[in-house]
Amino acid sequence: MADKVRQFTIYRIKNLDRAEQEYYRTLQRTLDKIEDDVIKLAGRELPTQAGKLIELQSAIAIRPKIRTILQTEFLGWANTVTKKGFNRQAKRIERAFKAIGNIPVEFQELTKGDLQLIRNLKLQTFTQFKDISNTFTKRLADKVYQNTLVGREFVELEKELRQTINGIYSKSDDREAQKLVSFIKANKNKKSMQSEVDKAVATLQSKFARDRAGDNMLKYSSQLLNDGLREFDAQVNAKKSFDAGLTFIKYFGDIIPTTRQICRDVLNGRYRKRKSNLFTIEEVRQLWQRQSWSGKKSGDPLVVRGGYNCRHQWTYVNPDWYDKEGNLII
């Protein structure tokens, strides 16, 4: 008998992966446009003499124009993620509940309470994207002012602005560097290409002095995209499960080389309490409280799971769905 609990949990996870990849690609295009628009704005609005920035008044006046660019492009993208992306995942959760069955029919569909939670989570995540927009509006405007104050060359300001937006993936006039950036962008999310991507990143770091871990808009946006999608799924799934009276949980997902040890151990049954590898909610919370690891995120483990960029998910079940040997029998 097919394990439909596993099947539909993996269905949720795989579609989260696809959604993240889709919106990461559109994020890249959005930030590339922001990068181009900000540089064009700076080139148009900031006077120079012998290539050096010379007028503080223009540097101050540019701030609201930078804000408009980020609000138009970035918040437009964020609105699509939190509306279209979240709605799609909510419908997948509903489909999984209907397919697994064995709970009251009224809880298999999205209820009024579920829809209210979905609206709240959309607003919460969009507000976090808005915070990123405001933060980087200030950082970009500050860089314009600071570089103008000391009369630096425009080309130096351009480099700082580009890397503040896209970090290691910012555009470059150097043909070899730009070729590496394009390759990394195209293959970053392909597991089969990770070795080649890492080599390209290493070349950018060593030969072109690019900083992979720097504070940039792409870094924070992609992190929130990942966590926002997966934590939305976790919270809506938990709400529906609690309403349906499901109080046991099981962990699902792939094990890959970068899988954290805590996730690997739970999936492999190191902390198994039952043959089915089910846990009570309290057992999971106590386990997470006792453990410490790199990338651990504060919050309820039912939501944050293994931490930043974790791609595993909990599914809520009834222990009566399993026999004494731990096999699913529904």
Cite the ranges covered by each PLM segment:
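Acidic, glycine-rich two-metal-ion catalytic cores of nucleic acid-processing enzymes
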Residues: 196, 212-323, 327-328
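N-terminal leader/targeting and assembly helices and adjacent pre-domain segments
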Residues: 1-213, 299-302, 315-330
